[in-house]
């Protein structure tokens, strides 16, 4: 990254901070709703020159920046999706305990640092402009993350100063998501080839053509999310997305947000490089090693104990089971030095194996995944299994998803072709288990099956691998489909989960801070969960129709 670009990013962050007094002045000093609600009727009028900086800040927070990453995502969704297992004895989240003081980091920032910025853009741009439409897409991206944790959230009246702000049901929120995306895509499509926000857009540098693909792929993601509860809507939105143009080529189409140590906005996973609190999960070890998946070299490092910095020696990669007790975490086999650290691109130069530095000086600047091309293909493959018009067969889309994921991570097309033809299945990872058993996490092969049930499992398994390290999306997929290859958590310290083979976390309960400051609205929101369900982590979201 050249100095001109670095200075540009620094200026973005400095100006955004200065704009806090301009835009965030409207934060309502309400007695309730955690004092984070804003009044959209008093949003400042700003000059056109300011708008791009507001967009940058909204993008930054909507994609979970480093300030919130660990406590918004890594301690929760990343472990629920079993990308990582926990090494730190002071965290209970891997044993399914939800710390309410942490998880608000995936709630409050959307109302304090995304909503006011985007509402200011809406109030100060033409509704038919690319700037306005791109802001609509970021809005959906942000609030999707919130509603997919909690279900009902303050939404339609968020931004209006009031003593109490009501929660809205998830089905209505998703309907608004589709409305916003449909409208944004309609505005952006005739503007293809133009530019909005320029380098202040941290994902595509203002390229509207790429934003059209991004918006359509996001719409396709949401369509599959609701496919079990609103199949007609899902098919309509999915087919419209594919017809209008989703991502097709990695890495060119991939949606990655820039991160930089300049301005303090580094990659969230990189932030944790030297803390040694998390390692590759046994689930990832079972699948990646069983498939002889070359992406393991990108996702993780050889164990420190191996003493061998050579990438690609599968025996040198090890993972830990999720849900270890404090005593089990201290067993030599489960120590951080005996299990695989996050990959090279997220590792500092303090990280060494066998005395060789395996980290990168630029690790803080590693772009952060938002939506990638491979996901678009796996979404289409799943839609094709349902009989939707996805433009190709489920098999060809599945294989294209693998090929594009390999391309994203710099693995050759030749290696992808060999992998696609492989009949390999996951293996026993050799990780600690309480009862001494050591079995493969699943029997799902890579090579396309003739069994439709197995085909869905294949699509979801490869999608799970391709989404790494986006635990938020992977956890949502698990709850929706229940076919991902996950081990039962070894121990639960959560009294609601007494059998981890049949029970799993399905949502985050409403925040205690919200119950204290917006209590009436939260009490009313419980009924929005439906079917008389209580406000706890075993209650399914609206789009999660799978029984345990």
Give the ranges of each region predicted by the language model:
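Structured, solvent-exposed acidic/aromatic patches
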Residues: 48-49, 83-413, 449-454, 462
């Amino acid at each position: 990254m050249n100095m001109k670009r670095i200075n540009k990013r620094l200026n973005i962050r400095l100006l955004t901070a200065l704009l806090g007094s301009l835009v965030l002045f409207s934060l309502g000093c309400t007695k309730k709703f955690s004092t984070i609600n804003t009044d959209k009727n008093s949003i400042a009028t700003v000059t056109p020159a300011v708008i791009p900086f507001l967009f940058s800040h909204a993008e930054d927070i909507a994609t979970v920046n480093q300030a919130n990453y660990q406590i918004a995502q890594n301690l929760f969704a990343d472990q629920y999706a079993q990308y990582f297992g926990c090494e730190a004895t002071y965290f209970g989240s891997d044993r399914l305990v939800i710390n309410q003081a942490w998880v608000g980091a995936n709630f409050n920032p959307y109302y304090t640092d995304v909503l006011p910025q985007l509402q200011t853009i809406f109030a100060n741009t033409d509704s038919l402009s690319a700037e306005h439409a791109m802001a609509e897409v970021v809005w959906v991206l942000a609030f999707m993350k919130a509603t997919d944790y909690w279900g009902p959230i303050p939404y339609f009246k968020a931004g209006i100063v009031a003593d109490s702000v009501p929660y809205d049901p998830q089905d209505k929120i998703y309907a608004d998501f589709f409305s916003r995306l449909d409208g944004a895509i309609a505005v952006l499509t005739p503007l293809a080839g133009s530019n909005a926000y320029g380098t202040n857009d941290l994902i595509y540098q203002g390229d509207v053509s790429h934003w059209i693909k991004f918006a359509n792929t996001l719409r396709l993601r949401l369509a599959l999310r609701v496919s079990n509860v609103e199949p007609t809507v899902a098919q309509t939105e999915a087919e419209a997305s594919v017809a209008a143009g989703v991502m097709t080529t990695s890495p060119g189409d991939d949606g990655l947000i820039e991160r930089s140590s300049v301005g303090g906005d580094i990659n969230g996973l990189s932030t944790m490089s030297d803390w040694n609190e998390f390692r590759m999960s046994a689930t990832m070890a079972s699948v990646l090693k069983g498939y002889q998946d070359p992406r393991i070299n990108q996702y993780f490092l050889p164990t420190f104990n191996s003493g061998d910095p050579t990438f690609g020696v599968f025996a040198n990669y090890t993972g830990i089971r999720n849900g270890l007790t404090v005593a089990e975490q201290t067993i030599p086999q489960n120590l951080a030095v005996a299990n695989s650290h996050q990959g090279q691109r997220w590792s500092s130069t303090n990280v060494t194996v066998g005395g060789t530095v395996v980290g990168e000086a630029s690790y803080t600047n590693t772009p952060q995944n938002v939506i990638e091309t491979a996901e678009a293909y796996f979404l289409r493959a799943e839609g094709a299994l349902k009989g939707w018009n996805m433009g190709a067969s489920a098999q060809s889309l599945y294989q294209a998803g693998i090929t594009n994921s390999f391309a994203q991570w710099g693995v050759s097309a030749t290696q992808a072709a060999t992998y696609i033809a492989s009949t390999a299945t996951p293996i026993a990872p050799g990780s600690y288990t309480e009862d001494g058993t050591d079995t493969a996490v699943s029997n799902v092969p890579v090579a396309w099956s003739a069994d439709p049930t197995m085909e869905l499992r294949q699509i979801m398994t490869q999608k799970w691998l391709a989404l790494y390290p986006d635990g938020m999306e992977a956890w949502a997929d698990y709850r929706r489909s229940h076919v991902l290859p996950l081990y039962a958590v070894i121990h639960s310290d959560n009294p609601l989960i007494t059998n981890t083979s049949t029970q799993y976390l399905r949502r985050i309960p409403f925040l205690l801070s919200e119950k204290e400051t917006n209590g009436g609205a939260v009490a009313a929101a419980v009924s929005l969960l439906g079917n008389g369900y209580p406000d706890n982590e075993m209650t399914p979201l609206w789009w999660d129709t799978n029984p345990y």
